[in-house]
């Protein structure tokens, strides 16, 4: 299966590593743009970007998936599936409809309780006894 992978933090990089060990082909990776962090305001690569570069996979880092040209670049790869794991940007309708088998989102909580950012941290801080990961097919609602 030909996959476009979208993710940014370490949680997402772990998923990318598993896919890279499979028979599937990662066509390209989408990740958040490099940002300054820490006291020295040093530019750090996201864990997903580092994993992609270590495996010679093309990386796109658009500020938004709605920027002109992003759709065409992704369309030209002819993906079977887009896998989104803690990416941090909304995926627009035209991109959701690109892959043959759709777009799957992996979220680090049992939805809907901790939707949004930092779901694992929120579950732990709230003392939740039941935690897990949600897998869902991303659909367009009209």
Predicted regions and their residues:
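One-carbon transfer enzymes
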Residues: 1-140
């Amino acid at each position: 299966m030909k996959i476009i992978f979208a993710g940014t933090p370490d949680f997402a990089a772990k998923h990318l590593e598993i896919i890279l060990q499979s028979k599937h082909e990662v066509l390209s990776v989408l990740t958040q743009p490099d940002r300054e962090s820490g006291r020295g305001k040093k530019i750090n690569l996201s864990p997903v970007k580092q994993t992609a570069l270590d495996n010679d996979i093309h990386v796109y880092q658009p500020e938004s998936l709605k920027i002109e040209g992003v759709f065409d670049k992704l369309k030209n790869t002819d993906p079977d599936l887009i896998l989104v794991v803690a990416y941090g940007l909304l995926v627009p309708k035209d991109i959701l409809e690109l892959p043959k088998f759709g777009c799957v989102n992996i979220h680090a909580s049992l939805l809907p309780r901790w939707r949004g950012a930092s779901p694992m941290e929120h579950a732990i801080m709230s003392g939740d006894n039941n935690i897990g990961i949600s897998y869902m097919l991303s659909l367009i609602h009209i």
